Amino acid sequence: MFGYVTVCEPELKVKDLKKYKAYYCGLCHVLKEEYGFIGQMTLTYDMTFAIILLSSLYESDTRADMHCCKVHPVKKQIMLTNEITSYGAAMNVLMAYYHMEDDWQDERKVSSLTVKTMLRGKVKKIMEQYPRQSRAIESALNELSVCEREGSTDLDKTAGCFGKLMEELFLYKKDRWEETLRKMGFFMGKFIY
């Protein structure tokens, strides 16, 4: 359920695609800076979407930088970052950790156990920094796991579990946007599931 959101490039204007890629590069950079190479390996489009949405909503002061990296070693790329990029990076790592946990529990993938173990210390710090989101994500995924183990055919119930998760993830801070962001996150989560 995590890592399924992608951008439909043919439908975006060139300027919008450039902006999307710049936020994606910004997230990648922050993941590396704050969580190291293993954090960078968790990069997804899902959080890029959330960062763009929240940055637009909160009109965060966004910094534009040019940089080269291993993926783009020759031509410098535009990188957009702000305070919400750090939040998105933390949520990205947290979601990746639980994704690895799920893969380990379901399929006994050694690679998932390895990555999960490497992320454990970083995730502990994220849980301390974002306790509300951490508890909600863990609770929703546990509820979803129970539904899956029971072989639940109630799609609304199982999709609702992931909706609850996304509802909390979209809620960057409790303010006047809380109700709107909760609804948006909930229904987007149900749709993704």
Q: Residue ranges of each PLM-predicted region?
A:
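Acidic catalytic motifs of isoprenoid enzymes
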Residues: 1-164, 168-184, 193
